[in-house]
């Protein structure tokens, strides 16, 4: 018969706790450990494929402990609200830990670094719990993925006749994505100006009709949004197209423009 009170503290990961005194006995209990897998998606499309020349690769996620007691991860103890591990996504936008990284308990995934071409704004944290040994908690479905907004910008310009400095109206320019090949046409107004900005012409007005300067422009498969730029993060080729207005003039050679900053 064991009498008296035995008090001990387990501070290291292991299978065996030994209580010593006038009597000695051992208790063996293995800690439940699991892992987590998360998916990065495009906010506008909901897809696991990026827009333009952006990428979902190398998104950084911090895994934070929400446990009142310290947890042991890779040989180190972490307190509540401390980052226990940072993981990064692969080319498919998936990041995963091993199946035994995290001990039993509650954790949170927070995006700490956005991938190239995306904003960190709007990326919501995801909470999850480790309850089964050797199981990787799957957060790759649409309901649990973490979403990012693609950077979007606009292009504007002025068409002037060489030698005359006269501004040319109704001149079409084709804008083509170097990554996807998607292309749309913008047309200069009476002052020889063109722009893809919603302040110039709503993205929603005759979207991509390309007939007049008042037709809106929008690249991508998501619904046009006047609060955003028309062109996703990418490199674009601008080509002047032949028309009556530029008849007799040599066309401007095609040139490239990079959209890399939001708005």
Language model features with spans:
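Solvent-exposed loop/turn and edge beta-strand elements of beta-rich ligand-binding domains
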Residues: 1-263
């Amino acid at each position: 018969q064991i009498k008296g009170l035995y008090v001990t503290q387990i501070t290291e990961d292991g299978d065996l706790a030994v209580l010593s005194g006038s009597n000695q006995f051992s208790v063996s209990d293995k800690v439940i450990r699991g892992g987590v897998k998360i998916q990065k998606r495009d906010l506008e499309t909901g897809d696991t494929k990026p827009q333009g020349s952006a990428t979902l690769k190398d998104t950084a996620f911090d895994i934070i402990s929400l446990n009142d007691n310290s947890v042991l991860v890779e040989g180190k103890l972490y307190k509540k609200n401390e980052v226990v591990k940072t993981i990064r996504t692969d080319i498919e936008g998936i990041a995963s830990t091993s199946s035994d990284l995290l001990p039993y308990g509650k954790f949170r995934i927070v995006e700490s670094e956005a991938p190239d071409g995306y904003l960190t704004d709007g990326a919501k944290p995801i909470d999850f719990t480790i309850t089964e040994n050797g199981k990787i908690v799957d957060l790759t479905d649409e309901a649990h993925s973490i979403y990012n907004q693609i950077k979007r910008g606009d292009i504007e310009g002025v068409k002037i006749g060489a030698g005359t400095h006269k501004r040319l109206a109704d001149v079409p320019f084709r804008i083509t994505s170097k990554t996807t090949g998607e292309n749309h046409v913008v047309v200069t107004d009476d002052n020889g100006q063109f722009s893809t900005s919603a302040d110039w012409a709503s993205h929603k007005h005759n979207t991509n009709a390309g007939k007049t300067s008042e037709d809106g422009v929008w690249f991508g498969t998501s619904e046009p949004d006047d609060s955003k730029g028309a062109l996703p993060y990418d490199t674009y080729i601008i080509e002047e197209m032949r028309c009556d207005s530029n008849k007799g003039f040599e066309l401007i050679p095609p040139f490239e423009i990079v959209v890399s900053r939001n708005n």
